[in-house]
Amino acid sequence: MKFTKMHGCGNDYVYVNLFEEKLDDPARVSIYVSDRHFGIGSDGLITIGPSDKADFRMRIYNADGSEAEMCGNGIRCVAKYVYDHKLTDKTEISVETGAGIKYLTLYVEENKVSQVRVDMGEPILTPGDIPVVKADGSAYSDDYRVIDEPISAGNREWHMTCVSMGNPHAVVFVDDVAGFELEKYGPLFENHKMFPKRTNTEFVEILSRNEAKMRVWERGSAETWACGTGTCATVMACILNKKTDNKVLVHLRGGDLTIEYIPETNHVFMTGPATEVFSGEIDII
């Protein structure tokens, strides 16, 4: 199997071009290639193929083989791949994802894509669509918004704000994100009974009205160096809690992303880098 390893702010995936390769069991392949000791080493597998709705279609598989709806860092790398590998010559493209069609603007330097701006669409705040339920398992009303909501995890009470960007996110504000015990608390949120489909969790430190720092525990992949949808959800949570303005520079372990919310259209835009690391071939056992 031919592959290309790419990353967006350190959120790394193995990319397979389905115009050239055939994958019978991508979930199993994702588990195999993601292993950082016995495989290629990545946060998962992303396939790039044809779409009858958009210019391209991407599918995302986590390191545990589960399929994700959307990946913000991954979709920027898809844009770089299709342009740099001459599958398109357009700098405005559309990509079909599990969370709908996304529209991307490619910024090109010396015939290579360096940055990508993604229209991440509208944030989803309806609890049943995220999904998130009450601690007793009952449903929130559709017009309720889970903002600064108490949640018990690890014998502590926290406050979270829940947003979906096509996949579920719980955002928690902390004082010191660098020293936060992510490995301890991340799994407790991911598998909490309030999240019927599990959740991604962002732990966020506010630096100013236009700047924040975050770490992310991803559903199915543990801590990753960056999460594009999570960064968008984080900025929406900051705005909903009146902690920042509508345009925020977010520092992640693997780099920086700029997120802008446009109230007039209710759309979130993400701008950030995409990097190709290397290409190769691997025998899937």
Swiss-Prot record:
It is found in: Cytoplasm. This is Diaminopimelate epimerase. Belongs to the diaminopimelate epimerase family. One of its GO terms (biological process) is lysine biosynthetic process via diaminopimelate. It comes from Agathobacter rectalis (strain ATCC 33656 / DSM 3377 / JCM 17463 / KCTC 5835 / VPI 0990). The active site is at C71, C227. Substrate binds at N11, N62, G72, N73, N167, N200, E218, R219, G228, T229. GO terms for molecular function: diaminopimelate epimerase activity. InterPro entries: DAP_epimerase_AS, DAP_epimerase_DapF. Catalyzes the stereoinversion of LL-2,6-diaminopimelate (L,L-DAP) to meso-diaminopimelate (meso-DAP), a precursor of L-lysine and an essential component of the bacterial peptidoglycan. HAMAP family: DAP_epimerase (MF_00197). It catalyses: (2S,6S)-2,6-diaminopimelate = meso-2,6-diaminopimelate.
